[in-house]
C-alpha cells in the first residue's frame, strides 16, 4: 500500500466507530471514539435528585450502552428532556456510558448503576437477567420485543472494489483476504459469523454440513482475527491488511456522512442486526427512577426518535419511518433473516460460540 493510501485509510479508521473493548484503547481517543467513555448530558441547570415524582425535583438517569448508538442518543435525549419537562415539570439529567457491549454488560453486572441498557445483542441483556438485574419478561414488556434499532452486515471494500466483492460467498474465494474481530471476544463479530452462516444455509438448502464447510473456507482467508472491532478496523484501514472488512452498515453510513471516502456492499442475503433496549429493573427501583426510565424507553420508539436513528444510518423500524425516501437510501436486501430463525440468542450462543461449538470447530478446520 502506498503512503497516501495508508493516510487515507487511517482517516477512515478514525471514522469507523465499532464496538471494542475499552481496555484496548490506549491513546488519541476522541469524544466520539469507542472506548469506555463517560459523558454527561445536562438537560438544564439544577440538582440530580433521583426522585421521579412530578414537580420541581430533578431526576438523573444513567444510560449505559454499546458505542454505536451514541450519536442517535445525543440527538434524542434533548427531545425527551423537553417533553418530560413540559409534561411533568421535572428536569432530567442523563449520565451516559459507552463502550464494547460485552464490557458494558460486565460493568453493569459488577455494579455500574445503569437505569437503562442499550446493548448490541439480546444475549448481553439476558446476562443482566441472569444477574437478577432485569426482569426475565423484558422483551414482552418492551415495544417491538425490545429491538429499538436495526441494521445489517456490510462488507467494507477497498476504493473501487477492485476484487469485485458482492456477497459473503466472495469471502471464501482464494484471491480474497479479509479482516474481522473474533466472535469469542466481540459481540459484533458474532453477528458477522451468523451473517455468513445464514448465507451459506440459504445457498445450500439448509445443509449445515455444507454451511460449516463454507464458513471454514471463508475464515481460512481471514488475515487478522482481532480481539475486538477497533483492532480489526485498524488492521484493515491503518495497516492495509485484507481486501474486505465486515462492519455494521449504519457505522459505514455514519462514517461516510462524516467525510470518510469508502465503499461498501450490503449483501442481498443478510441478517437483521437487532439491538435491544431494556430498563434495568433492580437499579431503577433502587434509584426511584422507574417512571422516567420507562418513559424514556417508550420515547425511543416514537416516530420522532426513530427518525434520528434512521438519519444516522439505522434501517427504518416502524411504519412512520419506512417511507420511500428513507428506504431508497439503503441497498436492497432481498433475503433477510433474524436471530429468531436460529432459535434466539441463547440457543445461538450455545450452538455456535460456546467452547467447542461451531465456531471453534471452524477454526480447528482452518488450522488443519
Per-region residue spans from a language model:
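Bacterial N-terminal signal peptides that target proteins for export
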Residues: 4-32
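Extracellular/periplasmic juxtamembrane helices and adjacent flexible linkers that interface
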Residues: 17-20, 30, 284-368
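C-terminal motif of bacterial Sec signal peptides marking the signal peptidase cleavage site
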Residues: 41-44
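N-terminal segment of the mature folded domain
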Residues: 50-185, 367
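Sec-exported extracytoplasmic/periplasmic mature domains
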Residues: 78-86, 109-113, 122, 129-133, ...
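Ligand-binding cleft/hinge of the Venus flytrap
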Residues: 79-88, 169-234
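Short helix-loop capping/hinge motifs at secondary-structure junctions, enriched
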Residues: 160-166, 185, 198-206, 283-291
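Ligand-binding pocket segment of bilobal, Venus flytrap-like solute-binding proteins
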Residues: 203-269, 276
Amino acid at each position: 500500500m502506498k503512503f497516501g493510501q495508508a493516510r487515507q485509510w487511517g482517516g477512515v479508521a478514525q471514522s469507523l466507530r465499532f464496538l471494542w473493548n475499552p481496555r484496548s484503547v490506549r491513546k488519541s481517543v476522541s469524544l466520539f471514539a469507542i472506548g469506555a467513555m463517560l459523558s454527561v448530558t445536562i438537560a438544564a441547570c439544577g440538582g440530580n435528585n433521583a426522585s421521579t415524582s412530578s414537580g420541581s425535583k430533578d431526576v438523573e438517569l444513567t444510560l449505559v450502552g454499546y458505542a454505536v448508538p451514541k450519536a442517535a442518543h445525543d440527538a434524542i435525549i434533548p427531545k425527551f428532556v423537553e417533553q418530560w419537562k413540559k409534561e411533568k415539570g421535572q428536569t432530567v439529567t442523563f449520565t451516559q456510558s459507552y463502550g464494547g457491549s460485552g464490557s458494558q454488560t460486565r460493568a453493569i453486572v459488577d455494579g455500574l448503576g445503569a437505569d437503562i441498557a442499550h446493548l448490541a445483542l439480546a444475549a448481553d441483556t439476558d446476562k443482566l437477567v441472569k444477574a437478577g438485574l432485569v426482569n426475565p419478561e423484558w422483551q414482552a414488556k418492551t415495544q417491538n420485543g425490545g429491538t429499538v434499532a436495526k441494521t445489517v452486515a456490510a462488507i467494507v471494500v477497498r476504493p473501487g472494489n477492485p476484487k469485485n466483492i458482492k456477497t459473503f460467498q466472495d469471502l471464501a474465494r482464494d484471491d480474497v483476504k479479509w479482516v474481522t474481530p473474533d466472535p469469542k471476544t466481540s459481540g459484533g463479530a458474532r453477528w458477522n459469523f451468523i451473517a455468513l452462516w445464514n448465507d451459506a444455509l440459504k445457498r445450500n438448502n439448509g445443509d449445515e454440513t455444507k454451511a460449516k464447510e463454507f464458513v471454514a473456507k471463508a475464515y481460512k482467508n481471514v488475515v487478522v482475527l482481532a480481539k475486538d472491532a477497533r483492532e480489526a478496523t485498524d488492521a484493515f484501514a491503518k495497516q492495509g491488511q485484507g481486501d474486505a472488512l465486515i462492519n455494521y452498515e449504519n457505522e459505514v453510513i455514519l462514517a461516510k456522512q462524516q467525510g470518510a471516502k469508502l465503499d461498501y456492499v450490503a449483501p442481498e442475503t443478510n441478517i437483521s442486526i437487532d439491538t435491544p433496549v431494556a430498563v434495568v429493573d433492580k437499579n431503577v427501583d433502587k434509584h426511584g427512577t422507574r417512571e422516567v426510565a420507562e418513559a424514556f424507553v417508550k420515547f425511543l420508539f416514537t416516530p420522532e426518535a426513530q427518525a434520528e436513528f434512521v438519519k444516522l444510518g439505522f434501517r427504518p423500524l416502524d411504519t412512520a419511518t419506512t417511507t420511500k425516501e428513507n428506504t431508497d437510501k439503503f441497498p436492497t436486501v432481498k433475503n433477510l433473516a433474524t436471530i429468531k430463525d436460529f432459535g434466539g440468542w441463547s440457543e445461538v450462543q450455545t450452538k455456535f460460540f460456546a467452547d467447542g461449538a461451531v465456531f471453534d470447530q471452524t477454526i480447528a478446520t482452518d488450522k488443519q
